From Swiss-Prot:
<protein>
    <recommendedName>
        <fullName>Serine hydroxymethyltransferase 2</fullName>
        <ecNumber>2.1.2.1</ecNumber>
    </recommendedName>
</protein>
<feature type="binding site">
    <location>
        <begin position="355"/>
        <end position="357"/>
    </location>
    <ligand>
        <name>(6S)-5,6,7,8-tetrahydrofolate</name>
    </ligand>
</feature>
<feature type="modified residue" description="N6-(pyridoxal phosphate)lysine">
    <location>
        <position position="230"/>
    </location>
</feature>
<comment type="function">
    <text>Catalyzes the reversible interconversion of serine and glycine with tetrahydrofolate (THF) serving as the one-carbon carrier. This reaction serves as the major source of one-carbon groups required for the biosynthesis of purines, thymidylate, methionine, and other important biomolecules. Also exhibits THF-independent aldolase activity toward beta-hydroxyamino acids, producing glycine and aldehydes, via a retro-aldol mechanism.</text>
</comment>
<dbReference type="InterPro" id="IPR039429">
    <property type="entry name" value="SHMT-like_dom"/>
</dbReference>
<dbReference type="InterPro" id="IPR015422">
    <property type="entry name" value="PyrdxlP-dep_Trfase_small"/>
</dbReference>
<dbReference type="InterPro" id="IPR015421">
    <property type="entry name" value="PyrdxlP-dep_Trfase_major"/>
</dbReference>
<feature type="binding site">
    <location>
        <begin position="125"/>
        <end position="127"/>
    </location>
    <ligand>
        <name>(6S)-5,6,7,8-tetrahydrofolate</name>
    </ligand>
</feature>
<keyword id="KW-0663">Pyridoxal phosphate</keyword>
<keyword id="KW-0554">One-carbon metabolism</keyword>
<dbReference type="GO" id="GO:0035999">
    <property type="term" value="P:tetrahydrofolate interconversion"/>
</dbReference>
<comment type="pathway">
    <text>Amino-acid biosynthesis; glycine biosynthesis; glycine from L-serine: step 1/1.</text>
</comment>
<comment type="pathway">
    <text>One-carbon metabolism; tetrahydrofolate interconversion.</text>
</comment>
<keyword id="KW-0808">Transferase</keyword>
<comment type="similarity">
    <text>Belongs to the SHMT family.</text>
</comment>
<dbReference type="InterPro" id="IPR049943">
    <property type="entry name" value="Ser_HO-MeTrfase-like"/>
</dbReference>
<keyword id="KW-0028">Amino-acid biosynthesis</keyword>
Length: 417
């Protein structure tokens, strides 16, 4: 029998030490990884609840286990809130991750070997958009489009040319490292021209979409997926959305369960319900606008300091800095910034001469620092510190000076007050 007073402390101190160290790292380091954010204590409360004990294979009102009357209410709340938040007719809140949501879409709409057209990973796409190392590139005939390296923008005429030539069954619009706004009407027109499904992966910009600050793909796409963390600030998980289409809804549901998953994680679904409610609060739009303002201000600092920002700037929460002209690698830059307690991620850039493990770029995002309370003033200062380190790569004195300034800034803006 378990006691309500059971604690990790005193029982598993080795684990607790690692957990506490990570929480302290989050407080002491500035987080600029575009896919990371801080979630609320309300979300954590739901995710750490007794709902983790309940198996609930199936869907609300149609389960394969008894005792699901209460978790049915939890899942239905999450579904209704997701639909309301994004203006969708259909929502599946069960995918354990964005990649599993994407896998369910493939399973629902395609046969193995079908042709899909997605954005190249090297140009800002995602692994699940047809990369050779992913299921999407192994099980399907994946054709890739990219950006015009002269402009840093997607060349929609080229996307259309490839689509006409290759006749994909599904076209994927979405990214993990593209800083400009996608033209969903143009993607829809291209898909219609070749008779393809249009699948939009909005994982990175879902929070901006929810706030009305980025175009909503729902009116144009046959199906939309997203993660529930990143700009949404919820638990790590996935979500599938669509307009009303009974045939497709059945396919999506079957592709998630039993096609790709067994029991849903009811504690995570509860946490998703919390984050959807939080995203409907009035302050959420102001937060997302600040995310964009901060990213644009930081990108301009890099441009002013002589660095190449891919696509010339940003419309969203992230941007890519190319270090090719400086002769630096993303790996070395990432490590140097880490020593100064600034966390970014190395990232491939167009025409990158380095391997994906080394790269010639950095991806920088502002969701986490904005949650922390940073405004444009702090982000401009922060971008300047990063440029100082890049201009003096490997200089321990510069790293130490920046680290001390980072410590002071983090103390002024704690993650959890």
């Amino acid at each position: 029998m378990f006691s309500k007073q059971d604690q990790i402390q005193g029982y598993d101190d080795a684990l607790l030490s690692a957990m506490n160290a990570e929480e302290q790292r989050q407080e002491d380091h500035i987080e600029l990884i575009a896919s990371e954010n801080y979630t609320s204590k309300r979300v954590m409360q739901a995710q750490g609840s007794g709902l983790t004990n309940k198996y609930a294979e199936g869907y609300p009102g149609k389960r394969y286990y008894g005792g699901c009357e209460h978790v049915d209410k939890v899942e239905q709340l999450a579904i209704e809130r997701a639909r309301q938040l994004f203006g969708a007719d259909y929502a599946n809140v069960q995918p354990h991750s964005g990649s599993q949501a994407n896998a369910a879409v493939y399973l629902a709409l395609l046969q193995a070997g079908d042709t899909v057209l997605g954005m190249s990973l090297a140009h800002g796409g995602h692994l699940t958009h047809g990369a050779k190392v992913s299921f999407s590139g192994k099980l399907y005939n994946a054709v890739q489009y990219g950006i015009d390296t002269a402009t840093g923008l997607i060349d929609y005429d080229e996307v259309e040319r490839i689509a006409v030539e290759c006749q994909p069954k599904m076209i994927i619009a979405g990214f993990s490292a593209y800083s400009k706004t996608l033209d969903f009407p143009r993607f829809r027109a291209i898909a219609d021209k070749v008779g393809a499904y249009l699948f939009v992966d909005m994982a990175h910009v879902a929070g901006l979409v929810a706030a009305g600050l980025y175009p909503n793909p729902l009116p144009y796409a046959d199906v939309v997926t997203t993660t529930t963390h990143k700009t949404l600030r919820g638990p790590r998980g996935g979500l599938i959305l669509a307009r009303a289409n009974e045939e497709l809804e059945k396919k999506f549901n079957s592709a998630v369960f039993p096609g790709g998953q067994g029991g849903p994680l009811m504690h995570v679904i509860a946490a998703k319900a919390v984050c959807f409610k939080e995203a409907m609060e009035p302050g959420f739009k102001a937060y997302q606008q600040q995310v964009i303002d901060n990213a644009q201000a930081m990108a301009q600092v890099f441009i002013d300091r002589g660095f190449d920002v891919v696509s010339g700037g940003t419309d969203n929460h992230l941007f890519l800095v190319s270090l090719i002209r400086q002769g630096l690698t993303g790996k070395d830059a990432d490590a140097a910034l880490g020593r100064a307690h600034i966390t970014v991620n190395k990232n491939s850039v167009p025409n990158d001469p380095q391997s994906p493990f080394v790269t010639s770029g950095l991806r920088i995002g502002t969701p986490a620092v904005t949650t922390r309370g940073f405004k444009v003033t702090q982000c401009v200062e922060l971008a300047g510190w990063i440029c100082d380190i890049l201009d003096n790569l490997g200089d321990a004195d510069v790293e130490a000076d920046v680290a001390s300034q980072v410590a002071a800034l983090c103390a002024d803006f704690p993650v959890y007050r």
